[in-house]
Amino acid sequence: MIKWPWKVQESAHQTALPWQEALSIPLLTCLTEQEQSKLVALAERFLQQKRLVPLQGFELNSLRSCRIALLFCLPVLKLGLEWLDGFHEVLIYPAPFVVDDEWEDDVGLVHNQRIVQSGQSWQQGPIVLNWLDIQDSFDASGFNLIIHEVAHKLDTRNGDRASGVPFISLREVAGWEHDLHAAMNNIQEEIELVGENAASIDAYAASDPAECFAVLSEYFFSAPELFAPRFPSLWQRFCQFYQQDPLQRLHHANDTDSFSATNVH
């Protein structure tokens, strides 16, 4: 039985949050006990600092809140919670939502249309999510809405807008941009060959550098076995930035499971 440090610190009148149940989602089971303990500590602080706002009748309970907080904190497990400064609210719809989108064409005409969004991240504003896609983020499939939007927040710490280059040292920027654009070109080539639906990486990654960083951050944490062998140089840059190696973590967890299985009598 794990001795969770947050339970020791709870005052007697507080109701214990269901952290152990919240950690049971497939994405988090590969973490070591030490990593899980640190992640929960960050998630507790996240819930103290941020306001989760349910919209359109969505019901937010303690388990859902804990799982949302854990996913927010996974990318900053080693970076620290201060990397999530700059927003105070997380707005949560029950399902994908409709927004007004304004864009300018090549001749300067401004167009307005209503589009369906899964999530949004504003540089100096809230993160907007929907519960259906949050639930789909619990497994290790390569899709993770929360990590995607967190990546955008981390990206904008480097400047006024998301560029696909997070806050790294200047001497590393050129190499990062080179490897990121090489990945985008590779993904685009696959799309042209097999089509968007058959591509092994979400086609959205080829749309622009900011989306490539966000999409590949999803794969970094939830499908490292797809990311690492395909883009090894960029993988190493992600490992250095996030200060984590999810592929090594996955291999260690699999080895542990195999060892346990062979020792069952």
Curated annotation (Swiss-Prot):
Zn(2+) binds at residues 111, 148, 152, 211. InterPro entries: MetalloPept_cat_dom_sf, MtfA_enterob, MtfA_fam, MtfA_N. GO terms for molecular function: aminopeptidase activity; metallopeptidase activity; zinc ion binding. It is found in: Cytoplasm. Coiled coil: none annotated. It is an enzyme of class 3 (hydrolase). This is Mlc titration factor A. It comes from Escherichia coli O127:H6 (strain E2348/69 / EPEC). The gene is mtfA.
